[in-house]
């Protein structure tokens, strides 16, 4: 799915024989990474919570988090409760460029605070500027299409996850398991 990200040389439509050039905006804050090359966004892990009864789960709930989330802490009790009450496995799936799919420095107060201060000076009417959203705001400001492209990447990653599930690649979940989607954002 990484081929959908800005910076990829593989943006091509076979049906229309049309190649797309990547047009990403530029930032002045060392956040101008080529999306296609953010390794932690391409190769990532996800958590699975399930009952400990040593059987393959015949159902799975894929949980999506909200925009700009950085940690699974508040979702773990929910995943546990969902798994316990339904008997299904729960997969905590990180959307593109979030959680463990974003460089750690994007969550660093020390590194993002100066960027937030600069944004506050540039956009004085924005009263919600903080180091917490400095990276995502700066990157989306430079290239708003990132929201669409990362959504498309997440969609394709989920298609791959379900393909792997159906092929039996998730040993504690039955290949015939039902799949439910659960999204939450504050």
Where are these regions (language model features)?
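N-terminal cap/lid segment of alpha/beta-hydrolase-fold proteins
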Residues: 1-56
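Short, charged N-terminal helix-start/capping segments
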Residues: 1-4, 91, 95, 181-186
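Conserved aromatic-histidine-acidic binding/catalytic patches
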Residues: 34, 66-74, 83-85, 146-153, ...
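Short, well-structured alpha-helical interface segments that form or flank functional binding sites
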Residues: 41, 59, 73-77, 85, ...
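Short, surface-exposed "cap/lid" segments of acyl-processing enzymes
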Residues: 45-125
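Glycine-rich, often proline-containing surface loops adjacent to acidic residues and nearby aromatics
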Residues: 57-63, 139-141, 185
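Alpha/beta-hydrolase active-site loop
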Residues: 108-172
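Alpha/beta-hydrolase fold nucleophile elbow
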Residues: 170-185
């Amino acid at each position: 799915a990484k081929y959908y990200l800005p910076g990829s040389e593989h943006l091509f439509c076979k049906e229309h024989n049309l190649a797309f050039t990547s047009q990403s905006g530029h930032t002045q804050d060392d956040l101008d990474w080529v999306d296609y090359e953010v390794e932690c966004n391409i190769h990532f892990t996800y958590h699975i919570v399930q009952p400990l009864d040593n059987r393959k789960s015949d159902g799975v709930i894929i949980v999506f988090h909200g925009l700009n989330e950085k940690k699974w802490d508040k979702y773990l009790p929910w995943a546990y409760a969902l798994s316990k009450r339904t008997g299904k496995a729960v997969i905590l799936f990180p959307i593109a460029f979030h959680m463990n799919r974003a460089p750690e420095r994007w969550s660093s107060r020390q590194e993002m605070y100066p960027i937030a201060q600069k944004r506050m000076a540039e956009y004085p009417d924005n009263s919600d500027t903080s180091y917490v959203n400095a990276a995502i705001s700066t990157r989306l400001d430079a290239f708003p299409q990132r929201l669409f492209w990362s959504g498309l990447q997440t969609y394709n990653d989920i298609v791959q996850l379900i393909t792997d599930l159906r092929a039996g690649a998730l040993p504690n979940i039955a290949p015939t398991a039902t799949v439910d989607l659960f999204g939450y954002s504050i």
